[in-house]
């Protein structure tokens, strides 16, 4: 926004504050009730605002040091947000690649390993599958194919941002 436009708007706001008035639309605006109750509109808004853009899952201080984590499902995707052993912020779908079970049930904590409660598959805080019991039953598998699915994540402005789609991107310049 140009400085001249900012000044014009600020002068208008100051005028209303000085005169104890508010800005109105010049009359009553009627909004159809289905604006607030329509499932179709809800789905459109949900997809537009919460699935197409990065969302805040916490503040930087919510992961105070290396090997700390938090979990959330704020926007329909179970997220495991971690700081790795070097303190870098990363995020993964909090879902075991084997059977789709939630890997970490605790909301917050500090650990370097996360184990799926279903079969005990264990992941490090880099999302890698590092172990699985009963190898005689599962056979040899390519661990690289069964890690936690990483989600686009960045730490900026004091917040932890995660995109709910693995194919999404986070770009604050747009």
Q: What residue spans do the PLM features occupy?
A:
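Non-catalytic accessory segments flanking enzyme active sites
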Residues: 24-25, 29-74, 78-79
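Residue-level signal for well-ordered alpha-helical segments
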Residues: 18-22, 26, 34, 49, ...
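Rieske [2Fe-2S] iron-sulfur-binding domain
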Residues: 62-166, 170-173
């Amino acid at each position: 926004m140009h400085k001249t436009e900012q000044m014009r708007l600020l002068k208008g706001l100051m005028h209303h504050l000085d005169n104890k008035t508010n800005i109105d639309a010049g009359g009553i605006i009627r909004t159809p009730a289905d604006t607030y109750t329509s499932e179709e509109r809800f789905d459109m808004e949900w997809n537009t605002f919460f699935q197409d853009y990065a969302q805040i899952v916490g503040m930087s201080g919510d992961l105070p040091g290396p090997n700390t984590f938090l979990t959330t499902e704020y926007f329909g995707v179970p997220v495991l947000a971690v700081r790795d052993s070097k303190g870098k912020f990363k995020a993964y779908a909090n879902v075991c690649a084997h059977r789709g079970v939630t890997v970490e049930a605790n909301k917050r904590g500090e650990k370097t390993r996360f184990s799926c409660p279903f079969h005990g598959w264990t992941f490090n805080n880099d999302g890698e599958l590092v172990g699985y019991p009963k190898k005689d039953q599962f056979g040899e598998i390519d661990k690289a194919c069964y890690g936690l699915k990483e989600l686009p994540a960045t730490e900026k402005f004091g917040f932890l941002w995660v995109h709910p789609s693995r194919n999404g991107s986070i770009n604050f310049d747009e």
